[in-house]
């Protein structure tokens, strides 16, 4: 079995967790372009506990992503578009995608550092570019970072300072591979009294840390190397899953030979 139930986010599974009355909490799912039968898989909003559909797309999938956004919006959902692997895309292609996206009902457009390859000045420039298109169209800009080079938190803060106001984060950086920006770090930076750190730490202690013992995520040298080379982390993930994943020099040699 390659995937667990949360790969698919079936409505019944979600309801088992959140119930029917979830108050002010917003629930969202990620839908990958070209990897879902979204016309059938995504229910009308009135039949779902979901509030938001987050469409994840590579640059060559933009036409499909736009149709997914329109479909989800027509069904009553808030929508976002996550432009993945942005570190591999030429500026002209990014601008063309943004021009198309601002004509859709999408609420937020995300800068996504899928490979954990971006540095702060690149994040600033990309955030400014996204805002140049999104803000006049009445849309928000978000940031989604990966921690390959220990920059997920710092780059999220850079985007926030530039004007991004949708910040992706997870408790203890929980996420595939190198993980993501840590929620508990952001709470400290925001200095907003409505955000309480202690309940987050309690959740990390009770639920996230036990998971960490079973699932390996977070910064490691193999993920750092793929981030430096602006590569998909699949080779690092494969290496980390091996029984003797200690020869980091051999891994270095293997990926630099490929380069």
Predicted regions and their residues:
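Catalytic cores and adjacent flexible loops of soluble metabolic enzymes
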Residues: 1-259
């Amino acid at each position: 079995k390659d995937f667990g139930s949360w790969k698919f986010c079936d409505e019944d599974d979600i309801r088992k967790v959140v119930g029917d009355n979830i108050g002010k909490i917003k629930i969202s799912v990620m839908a990958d372009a070209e990897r879902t039968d979204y016309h059938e898989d995504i229910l009308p909003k009135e039949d779902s506990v979901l509030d938001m559909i987050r469409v994840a797309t590579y640059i060559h999938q933009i036409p499909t992503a736009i149709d997914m956004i329109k479909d989800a919006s027509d069904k009553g959902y808030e929508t976002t578009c996550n432009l993945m692997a942005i570190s591999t895309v030429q500026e002209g292609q990014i601008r063309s995608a943004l021009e198309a996206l601002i004509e859709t009902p999408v609420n937020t457009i995300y800068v996504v550092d899928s490979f954990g390859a971006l540095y702060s000045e690149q994040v600033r420039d990309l955030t400014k570019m996204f805002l140049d298109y999104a803000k006049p169209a009445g849309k928000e800009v978000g940031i989604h970072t990966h921690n390959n080079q220990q920059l997920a938190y710092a780059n999220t803060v850079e985007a926030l300072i530039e004007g991004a106001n949708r910040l992706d984060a997870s408790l203890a950086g929980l996420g595939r591979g190198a993980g993501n920006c840590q929620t508990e770090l952001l709470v400290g930076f925001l200095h907003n009294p409505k955000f309480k750190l202690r309940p987050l730490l309690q959740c990390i202690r009770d639920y996230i840390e036990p998971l960490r013992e079973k699932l390996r995520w977070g910064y490691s040298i193999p993920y750092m190397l793929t981030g430096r080379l602006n590569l998909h982390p699949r080779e690092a993930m494969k290496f980390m899953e091996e029984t003797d994943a200690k020869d980091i020099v051999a891994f270095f040699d293997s990926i630099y030979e490929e380069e």
